[in-house]
Amino acid sequence: MVLQNESDKDINLGHRCYMEKTNKTALLLINTGSPDAATVEAVRRYLAEFLGDRRIVELPRWKWWPILHGIILRTRPKKSAERYKSVWTDEGAPLIVHTKRTASALEAELGIPVYWSMRYGSPSTASVLDAMRADGIDRVLVMPMFAQYASQTTAACLDGISEYQLSHVDVPAVRTIHDYHDDPAYIDALATHVRAYWDKHGAPVSMGGRLVMSFHGIPKASSDRGDVYEAQCRRTAELLAQRLGLERDQWCLCFQSRFGRDEWLRPYTVDSVRELGAAGVTRVDVVCPGFAADCLETIEEINDELRREYLSAFRGGGQSEFHYIDALNESPEAVKAYATIVRREAAGWL
């Protein structure tokens, strides 16, 4: 009989734990998030978390906290809740619905587990990482659902991963997808998606119209400090225009969803579309290449509010048309593109 001392037992236990590693790989999709419900209280909770992130509002806390808690969270939730109600579906918030469907389609395409989380709201990244650990996942490829990198989006999502790693002892191996703004698979998906819409509704350029590529804006100060977002948006727009065979005067790039009083990236989408209407451009098609899934900012802000702005500003003769081309969502072309990117980024794991 061979006796083992305590150190031998510890070594064997450690060896056994190591051998039990499954090398099981999974994909984690992360998007910004939505309130849990289109109610004032749910929106207030969501805005408190979202606007409380230093990535989103970079003001010193002593200056921002009184504004956020003393003014914004008292006045904005009611109006925002009404806006969310206008886009809410039987399944919930559009962003959540489309992200969930995209994850399911990718899981079928890739043959690996695909999880999804939200940086703000539910399901939180921490809760999903807990579920992944419980499922035996020990290698995670993180894909923030933003083709163009920005501190306020991609980096904020990756902060959620870092926070989890800091608070846990045993964490999975992690790889992250930084951006895919000029990836041929992504550009092909966008072009296929736009052409499919034009096959059904005609192309604006055949009517003397314009394709407007609207990206979410960020503060100009962020870009001035070196954020690559603006340059990546412009590159995406140029590549998409080339793939669609558009001349430079047949499309334009602009930025939407400005928040607060600071200057954001220009030109602003609402100004650009008003100018097109005032100039008598009879058809305007808007596509939002930076939005992986339709949400409040595309459905309500673009398809509803921006439509009204264009029609109100239109000064030409005859009929005017405004078309919103929906986000990639869970379309076959989107799933194919994401799968191509994931297989490359997960090389050696899959």
Q: PLM ranges: what are they?
A:
Residues 18-350:
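Active-site-proximal alpha-helix that buttresses catalytic centers in soluble enzyme cores
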Residues 1-2, 19:
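Accessible peptide chain termini
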Residues 8-12:
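Intrinsic-disorder-associated, low-complexity terminal segments enriched in Asp/Asn/His/Tyr and depleted
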